[in-house]
A protein has these predicted regions:
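Active-site-adjacent structural elements in enzyme catalytic domains
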Residues: 65-70
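A structural signal for small-residue-enriched, beta-sheet-centric alpha/beta enzyme cores
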Residues: 1-57, 61, 72-317
Length: 317
């Protein structure tokens, strides 16, 4: 769900049943809700959904709307006679992109969270300028929602969905090549070859101004049967894909957070390297998803938008 006037939005991912989940936060200025319970030592094991939202701290209201939707469906942790949905959340800072930010007493993000939860039941979502990525930007191009998936040699499916609102850049210098270029599959973000060599200018750090708040938030998921500790390891390895795809990442004013979810549909062979392969695949999927989020983004349908151009405006085929 998104609001074209506000230039912000919410993405909700709902689970068919409680899924094992954990998370890692390496950004210096995160905004999250109920992520402490994802620590492997905490009691609650499964989540009913995860929310990725714009709006900075205001966006944390979005989980409330998702909770309401799930409770109406009688979904949640069974505590005596009460259902308590478990829905962690992370937010991005998109308050400086123009748009109407004086929404007053209207529960804007709660309403968008509720709408996003209803929309999630369809199982489909749009890439680019949509949902939690509607108002997202990067240092040099419009950001957005990205996604990618793959199958491991062991037969497990791994996927990633990300809101790319990076403080840095996902592309190399002034050219069209992505830092995630080496892991691209089937030209999914333009098929631009990775440069054979990098110049000093290519390596120069690019940021949104001096040190503005930003954040890239993501979910990686697998059908493998994992423990909470193993999901945490998968999130940690997946986060390396974020660092490969964006320069810089995990900065002092970033809130970079990666959730990992396991649907428990396929057993994991713990005698070999299957868990390591899951983490590697999750990192590759996240790097690809970041590039796709930028490649697919278009400018918001609002004349009030303040931000960089869309990638394909600058690098048209």
């Amino acid at each position: 769900a998104d609001d074209r006037d506000v230039i912000s939005g919410v993405t909700a991912i709902l689970c068919e049943r409680p899924n094992i989940a954990s998370a890692i936060t390496r950004g210096g200025a995160p905004g999250t809700r109920d992520t402490a319970l994802l620590d492997p030592e905490m009691t609650v094991q499964g989540v009913d959904g995860i929310v990725l939202s714009g709006g900075s701290v205001y966006g944390l209201d979005a989980a409330g709307g998702v909770l309401c939707h799930l409770r109406q469906k009688n979904i949640g942790l069974d505590v005596a006679a009460v259902r308590v949905p478990i829905v962690p959340q992370a937010i991005t800072f998109d308050l400086l992109n123009g748009g109407k930010k004086d929404w007053g007493r209207t529960p804007l993000y709660w309403n968008m969270g509720y709408a996003a939860a209803k929309a999630a039941e369809g199982g489909r979502f749009q890439l680019g300028t949509a949902g939690g990525g509607y108002g997202a930007t990067t240092a040099n191009y419009k950001g957005g929602i990205g996604s990618a998936s793959m199958r491991t040699a062991a037969g497990h499916t791994v996927g990633a969905i990300v809101v790319v609102n990076a403080i840095g850049s996902a592309t190399i210098g002034d050219g069209p090549a992505f830092w995630a270029g080496p892991v691209e599959i089937d030209g999914e973000y333009g098929g631009v070859p990775f440069p054979p060599a990098l110049s000093d200018k290519d390596r120069t750090m690019r940021m949104k101004g001096a040190s503005p708040p930003s954040t890239t938030i993501a979910i990686v998921a697998t059908d493998a049967s994992l423990t909470k500790q193993e999901a945490r390891r998968m999130a940690q390895m997946a986060d390396d894909g974020l660092a490969r795809a964006i320069r810089p990442a995990h900065a002092p004013m970033d809130g970079d957070t990666v959730f990992a979810v396991a649907t428990q549909r396929r057993p994991l062979d713990r005698t070999g390297t299957a868990l390591t392969e899951l983490g590697l695949s999750a990192a590759d999927c996240l790097a690809r998803a970041i590039a796709r989020g930028i490649f697919e983004a278009t400018l918001p349908a609002s004349p009030a938008y303040v931000g960089p151009p869309a990638y394909q405006q600058v690098h048209s085929s």
